[in-house]
Design a protein with these regions (language model features):
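A detector of single, family-specific signature residues
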Residues: 1-277
Length: 277
């Protein structure tokens, strides 16, 4: 078509394979979360308030108590042998939290939920090994990505980003092109000098949730004030959602610069210099 139609960006085969496994891993994680919520519902219906006394209902202490409740329904017992030494909740509060009684139908449902959670976790571990193997050839790129704030907390985070964007930033002439491709720039719906919508586009359906998750975690940390300062400034005038998208754009700009220049992240250069007006 004489270069009249711009081609779509399609990453290489290795990245597409990595992306497929990473998205499947995300679905497994969502399935695991759903099963945990169902298990918590069983406990709540049975008046077993373990979520009030344990920060993680599926931790060692809480899980051992749940297993005993399933194996000995309706039996009163002392919770002391099941409590881990590091548990800070008073024993009396934990004892009061297990005074409820679980019915047979709820016990069946809870047991199935716990078994399903364990099965999903096994599948996730197998997928993680395959993901690590596929990501091995991209180790230099991943090392650069992990210099960016928010991508250095867990190794899998940088792999997830890489699987969505690929290692080659030359396909995006500028960081603005990259941000637009990721779906983090406002649309320009205008007609007769009237602006109909400035909402962000629907592109990046898998990338944007990941960026928002990283941005929220980054804002909770005590480091990297350049992100927090920008978030607070925008939130004060335009609200939380627009401020979070602004942080996502900062992350995308940092990613584009790091991969384009093949240089580690620097707080001084996370944004391109703006041209003088």
């Amino acid at each position: 078509m004489c270069d009249m139609i711009k081609p779509s960006f399609i990453p290489g085969l290795e990245i597409r394979q990595l992306r497929d496994l990473m998205r499947y891993r995300t679905k497994l994680t969502n399935m695991k979360t759903s099963e945990k919520n169902r298990a918590l519902n069983c406990l709540t219906v049975s008046n077993l308030k373990l979520d009030d006394v344990f920060s993680d209902v599926f931790g060692k202490s809480s899980t051992s108590i749940i297993q005993y409740l399933l194996e000995h329904p309706g039996e009163s017992f002392d919770v002391r042998p099941f409590i881990h030494a590091r548990c800070k909740t008073p024993v009396e509060e934990i004892q009061a939290a297990v005074e409820g009684a679980i019915s047979v139908p709820q016990a069946i449902k809870l047991r199935q939920c716990l078994n399903h959670i364990n099965e999903i976790e096994k599948h996730r571990e197998e997928i993680n090994l395959e993901i690590q193997a596929l990501a091995e050839p991209f180790s230099p790129v991943l090392e650069l990505l992990r210099t960016i704030p928010g991508l250095d907390t867990q190794p899998i985070t940088a792999i997830a980003i890489l699987s969505e964007i690929g290692p080659d930033m030359s396909v995006f002439p500028t960081s603005k092109h990259f941000i637009s491709w990721a779906g983090c720039c406002p649309r320009n719906d205008r007609s007769a000098r009237r602006t109909k919508s400035t909402r962000i586009s629907r592109a990046g359906q898998s990338l944007k949730p990941l960026l928002v998750q990283i941005a929220n975690a980054l804002l909770r940390s005590k480091e990297h004030p350049e992100f927090k300062n920008r978030y607070r400034r925008i939130k004060a005038n335009r609200g939380h959602k627009k401020a979070i998208i602004a942080i996502c754009k900062m992350l995308l700009t940092a990613i584009w610069n790091v991969l384009s220049k093949v240089e580690p992240y620097s707080a001084k250069g996370y944004l391109e210099p703006k041209p003088a007006k």
